[in-house]
Amino acid sequence: MFTEYTGNRQFDLQLNRTFAPILDRVGIDTIATATLPRVRSTQQITALAQNLAERFEKQGDADAAWRLYELAAFYLGADDPRKHRFIDAMSRTFDEAHRGLALTRHSVPYRGGELTAMRWEADPADQAQAPSGTPTTLVMMNGFDGYAEEIIDFASHFPARPFDIITFDGPGQGHTAAAGMPLEPEWEHPTEAVLDYFGVTSAAALGVSFGGYLVMRAAAYCPRITHVIAFDMMYRLLDGLTVPLPRALRPIADAVIENPRPARLIDAGLGMASRLSADLSWKLQQARHLTGLRRPSQVLRAFGDYTMEAFEGRITQPCLVLAGDADQY
């Protein structure tokens, strides 16, 4: 269930993402009904999430704390020291919350740096009962703003776990982006590096949000991927900027995106628009962080590389493509 706390779709998406799993905690129901509807800025979200995260950590509720630390970091720029502090706290409390599980962290060598990866081993009982032909490994890919912790926690909702689950922060994602490795279009390369590291010869792959595009790109060029789930599927990354716009403005936005020149005009226009929209402001901030580029016109040109048009017809694996009627992206 999606709750409209504030009326701001971007804010409500992040608040639902964090608070839905912890609504049963003492006092959270009051916060959900009395405090969240009054939220009007990213600064308020950061302060509220930090206070709650620190409170729950002191109370020993690491499962609530890691989710709130992630939200506290969400809207902060990469140059804000609080972001790194909150992400470190998220990882620390996530590990505490999942202590005792067959879940391990890994650093996968890649292009002179490292990809953060996590592996959750299959449940032996589920594995023994799995039908013949069940994949032995599931690789899960996050998207535009996720971390390995969040995406692998998603697997806790699976009714059974007859396969190893591997997730990783690729270039431009989560911990890997924070370490300075920018987003790259050839997603098969980091995927192959992760499969090599774990000695995986075949795997199913699932992508969430922008990961729904990345998993398709990886499948098109990585034959070790045998089955694909896109949850949901994004044909091109730039749709994330244009789809939320009023329908009448989308053709204009598409025209600007396809030819982001003159650059100074585009930079000035998007800079002005972002001051009027918290959603656009955050998207541009996050895009700069992931790509390592500074100007909006540069970001638009770089995002143009993330489209399925270039590899149409190359995906031959069985695919399950999911989409929601009210999806934002």
Residue ranges and their predicted role:
Residues T42, A49, D80, H84-A130:
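N-terminal cap/lid segment of alpha/beta-hydrolase-fold proteins
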Residues I315-T316, V321-A323, D327:
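Short beta-strand/loop motif that positions the catalytic acidic residue
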Residues I229-V256:
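Flexible "cap/lid" loop of the alpha/beta hydrolase fold
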Residues Q129-G143:
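Short beta-strand element of the alpha/beta-hydrolase
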Residues F158-H175:
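Conserved alpha/beta-hydrolase
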Residues E150, H157, A179-V200, A204-A205, ...:
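Alpha/beta-hydrolase active-site loop
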Residues A205-G207, G212-P223, V228-Y235:
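Short glycine-enriched nucleophile-adjacent loop
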Residues L293-F311, Q317:
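Active-site nucleophile elbow and catalytic-triad environment of alpha/beta-hydrolase enzymes
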